[in-house]
Amino acid sequence: MDLAANEISIYDKLSETVDLVRQTGHQCGMSEKAIEKFIRQLLEKNEPQRPPPQYPLLIVVYKVLATLGLILLTAYFVIQPFSPLAPEPVLSGAHTWRSLIHHIRLMSLPIAKKYMSENKGVPLHGGDEDRPFPDFDPWWTNDCEQNESEPIPANCTGCAQKHLKVMLLEDAPRKFERLHPLVIKTGKPLLEEEIQHFLCQYPEATEGFSEGFFAKWWRCFPERWFPFPYPWRRPLNRSQMLRELFPVFTHLPFPKDASLNKCSFLHPEPVVGSKMHKMPDLFIIGSGEAMLQLIPPFQCRRHCQSVAMPIEPGDIGYVDTTHWKVYVIARGVQPLVICDGTAFSEL
């Protein structure tokens, strides 16, 4: 109303000004055409300008969206350094063929025989290269050249006298032995839903799982608003994480302070055995297939046996790392999900 009244008053004043200009023009002897031209120029210069229409609600919506976009962009750049690295790029067609030809050439080498997935056993020593795993025995160790009369050093007794035990869940020991390596076949792999839940709840305890920013946020949104690692989060209860992801540990003889470090997503290598992943004393196969290798210290190799055995989803392994070096090799077609931790709080 005020704007309309203001415009009316302006036009009234302009009308009075036009009449005054017309009278003055006639008095000065100007022609009618010259007077009209002068009035037209006057009106064009003094025409009131109507301000553009304003939509306050739309402006508020624009500001809110711009603020949210800025917050998400800032959060992304803050989180990105703490996110796991993306997997290696897929090889092009030319690289794939070159890798295949290189793989075929390597198959003829003697060292390649011990990593061949077609063999049921993994030979680790000299003349036993062609020795397969027995069908009834899930693991195999190589024969070491040991002199019975030669005394065993004190730091080699752990690997020389405590051999790897492979057992079913119902046969698991009731008492935990620190020096005794063992593999417990639970037959309980991680389901995809359990892995996804773990990724949402504990993103800082994962490695190698690559997923887009918004895809991960959308998948975890109802359960968790911010499913990404951030530095100001309080320390995780890793013992609780272990038993939450693997409830079977409540029935096993491991110490109560056994904890979970991280879960990793590993791709099988084009050349079987070309990449070995070092493990701590406690590890669990969530999904996929792998080969376990236990190698004694160099000074103990005359008294201790190297061990190699295939492990499968649901297998729980424990090895005292003071007497063994523990390695896992991803094999097969499916990616390997493996979780590692420790049975002792001091590690």
UniProtKB/Swiss-Prot annotation:
Keyword Membrane: yes
Protein name as catalogued: Bombesin receptor-activated protein C6orf89
Job of this protein: Exhibits histone deacetylase (HDAC) enhancer properties. May play a role in cell cycle progression and wound repair of bronchial epithelial cells.
Miscellaneous section: Named amfion, after 'the 4 Amfion heroes in Greek mythology and their deeds in different locations within the mother land.
Gene: C6orf89
PANTHER family according to UniProt: BOMBESIN RECEPTOR-ACTIVATED PROTEIN C6ORF89
One of the GO BP terms on file: connective tissue replacement
GO CC term, one of those recorded: midbody
Maturation and modification: Glycosylated.
